[in-house]
């Protein structure tokens, strides 16, 4: 294997491998922005099609299905699979249409393995029909898009809402699927979920949930607009998709002290958007009802006539993956007015309350730790995972060879991190090898399954833990970009790893090609306190004089969980605003997740949520499907050599979950019971695994074997979720 060549290939495509991170919403968000009781006042029987009060100016665009379309932006199934991104006539000044095409291309590929051997075009993808049959078609879907901001009147919120209505939408059998963005992405950040809806003639209700990939470039004071194009903050005014809330004097002082920095909406809006992700999902649904009726001509109907598409005649499924899946569950918990009928989500991020009284047992053995919120376990991983990935027991893990070859990282950085952890009293072993083994065992003890072991190296190589910890730390604490929380900032870097002006082409296209959570599109994490001046975090020398990937910053982030200073208290309060209740109000629901998930470990999300739901939802209809040999990032399967031999695509099970919930709501078909699905990896040679077949990815069943059943019991106020080995 040519490690330098392969690592360069990974870095070139890293901006397409968007992170899908966790998120949820507390009930404190209910009732704001015109949603009475998280339901709103646009009742099924209301005559006239009243635009929701939170919706601003609406733009409607037509996509003909030939040169452009809703699902592939005119690229077709083959274009989405192409390794070459769509061209832009003027790279530093892309048009809105060019950015939309780039966004759909990048977002789809970030979420889906588009390699034919991985199942694209045979098991899933635009050219596979609703019955799972491969076709020779392009998969393009004609229709219209309605897009608008949801705002609270300040121009600071400006959450993007988008509704796609296919021409095939059937008013006699109306359906709506939500597709809240995954990760910190923009509006098309769950396009792979939207695909299912469009194929089934449903409207798709998207929201960027107050995140997005377009930054505020503080050096030039330019900001993204709703369509991803850029202008000055002054010219944008209240139409900016995001502008950091700074005065001119604050900005000037910040630029003088810390030049060439960027602010991102998820991290720096100072609004803790995660607390409102469920609310924004409900707003997207309400906007969808209005948009559909508008397209159907409801404005011209006689007074007193019922609207064609209403809550009482429309199937609405809250869906998405990762952050978006957590948002869908949050919306279903908050929905007291009947906007949502069912839930089908993949790998959702779910923050459980500390008093959940839920325990998880695997193979009859109760696990010592489960049900932690995202920032808790990701800040823990941010300390130990880089060291743990060098354990001899996982030396064959994908990307581990890149560390050994010092490709993109300092030489010996893993051993340096292990030694620094020992110097700080966090490890006790004396040798680098023993320290790595100890760090890996710490991850196991904190909730990561052994099945995640081979994923730790790539999680570390792509800096996923520090990126999540820094962005969520800022967001939860409502930190300003001025605060440089834990002495981190965001900037492009020069050849010496010091901050420099961001590349003009990268900046112009970042709203489409970025993922909203640095490192992304050439924007790096910066250690402001590095020896020798601000330096790219993973390349920095910290206070101890070691190249240990900024352990000082990682320790600072971890300490926010228990600290008593203002930033720590703000973060702790922010987490409390994102906790789930577990009560889905009896809605039929399916959660699917891969057992190998190393980003959102099953023991901190789906498994304990099943127990929380059993305690709080007296009419529960929730089932949980745990898929063996599946992990969080399907986009990595063809990107990272070795993933293809080890992992099956979870997207297939996410679509099957939608099939099952839709059949339940449409025909009364029972949902499958909670179970483990035992898949078969493709095997073969890393980077050249044989083609997947249906035999590799069996469906879940209505009658799982006893050894595959996942059980839930409640006794003495404690729910126990029992998962087989």
UniProtKB/Swiss-Prot annotation:
Family: Belongs to the D-(-)-3-hydroxybutyrate oligomer hydrolase family.
The keyword Acyltransferase is assigned to this record: no
Keyword terms: Hydrolase, Secreted, Signal
Active site (record annotation): 322 (charge relay system)
This protein's name: D-(-)-3-hydroxybutyrate oligomer hydrolase
Biological process annotations from GO: butyrate metabolic process
HAMAP family xrefs: 3HBOH (MF_01906)
Reactions this protein catalyses: (3R)-hydroxybutanoate dimer + H2O = 2 (R)-3-hydroxybutanoate + H(+)
